[in-house]
A protein has these predicted regions:
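Nucleotide-activated donor-binding/catalytic signature segment of Leloir-type glycosyltransferases, i.e.
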Residues: 233-250
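Aromatic "clamp/platform" in nucleotide-sugar-dependent glycosyltransferases that forms part
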Residues: 269
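N-terminal strand-loop element at the rim of the active site
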Residues: 10-71, 157, 357
Length: 366
């Protein structure tokens, strides 16, 4: 008789909007393909991305408000993990609040937990205090960082030993065939969460203004949802770009819009392993990006599949945008190299790396 499949729980804030949340959805698909029994546990009732496995939506299960709501969610999560006999948990949440993580330490008691690290801004995931971080996470805690730079920074700052880099994979649906161009006006594209503190739209819009691309007939489209949509619109008006910049709503499958862009742009203060860059290159669209910590430098070979420029420099970003638009030979080279530059992020390759890690964990505890 065949043995029952190993069980995995993926705990995520939601399955909507953010790059980390999309990664959680992609992991659920990947683990189901590997034959694991997958349980996706969403803290909030926000479900947009395609996922596989059994969904436990705590946002629906708990109806109370305030701090009591958070406590009830934690209790229900612990009960669910116990009732389903789940021994391995992948925690995909941000973890900035110490006392909340004390509660989750109790929730995860006697289980193998893999803590995802999606951002170079480590305080979003680990307490700034070395002592408190080591109280929450022992030296045997397994961390998976989505970039080499993040993994190195965790080891340097905290001294944790079990830190592994596994890049985010290219989603299945980016591997579709090219779509015919339907847009009459050419454009460049930013896509992601509309959060100025992270994505730095001020820099993006200033650079676009300086680049002169609006005069050349190349529009800028900004696609996504988030708290700073009104701020971005105000900046567009102040820079007198209202006729040249369009804000598009978030799309759970944005790849047609990406494919039709001439190139995409990233202007972030910080990242982890920016899926916007991965997804753009995967559909053959070059990227102009600032060299923020971390991720772009591990994805973009400047002059080969896009252009990488110093961060917080509007003129440098503007010059790169103008260069990729006007230098036909450079553009064609970057476009031709884009897809093959992320072949190492294929679903098959990343799936094998995850399977190897999980098999080691299960073999130790079976």
């Amino acid at each position: 008789m065949a043995s029952a499949p190993h069980k995995i729980a993926i705990v995520t804030t939601s399955l909507a909007q953010g790059g980390a949340e999309r990664v959680a959805a992609n992991l659920s698909v990947m683990f189901c393909q590997l034959g694991y029994e997958v349980h996706v546990i969403s803290i909030n009732n926000s479900i947009d991305f395609h996922y596989s496995g059994q969904l436990y939506n705590l946002g629906i299960e708990v109806q109370t408000k305030g701090w009591l709501r958070k406590i009830q969610k934690a209790i229900l999560l612990k009960r669910y993990l116990t009732s389903q006999q789940i021994s391995v948990v992948i925690d995909n949440r941000t973890r900035p609040v110490f006392w909340r993580e004390v509660v989750y330490k109790w929730v995860y008691q006697n289980r193998n937990v893999i803590y995802m690290m999606h951002s170079f801004k480590l305080e979003n995931y680990l307490h700034k205090s070395h002592i408190l971080a080591h109280f929450l996470y022992t030296n045997n805690t397994q961390f998976v960082a989505v970039s080499q730079a993040i993994a190195q920074e965790i080891q340097r700052k905290y001294g944790f030993k079990k830190v592994q880099t596994i890049y985010n994979s290219i989603p299945d649906f980016t591997e579709s065939q090219a779509v015919p161009t339907t847009e009459s006006v050419p454009y460049i594209l930013f896509f992601g969460r509309l959060d100025n503190q992270v994505k730095n739209f001020s820099l993006l819009l200033q650079a676009y203004k300086k680049s002169g691309l609006s005069d050349a007939g190349l529009q800028l489209k900004i696609m996504g949802d988030g708290p700073d949509a009104a701020f971005i619109l105000e900046q567009i008006n102040q820079l007198q770009l209202i006729d040249f910049v369009a804000i598009l709503p978030f799309q759970s499958e944005p790849f047609v819009v990406i494919q039709q862009a001439k190139f995409t742009v990233l202007s972030s203060q910080y990242e982890g392993f920016p899926m916007a860059v991965v997804e753009s290159l995967a559909v053959g669209v070059p990227v102009v990006s600032v060299d923020c910590q971390s991720g772009p430098a591990e994805l973009i070979q400047s002059g080969e599949n896009g252009l990488l420029v110093p961060n917080h420099n509007a003129q440098a970003l503007a010059d790169a945008m103008y260069e990729l638009h006007t230098n036909t030979a450079l553009y064609e080279k970057c476009k031709n190299n884009a897809q093959k530059s992320v072949e190492h992020l294929s679903l098959k390759s990343i799936r094998a790396q995850w399977n190897n890690l999980l098999q080691v964990i299960y073999e130790k505890h079976d």
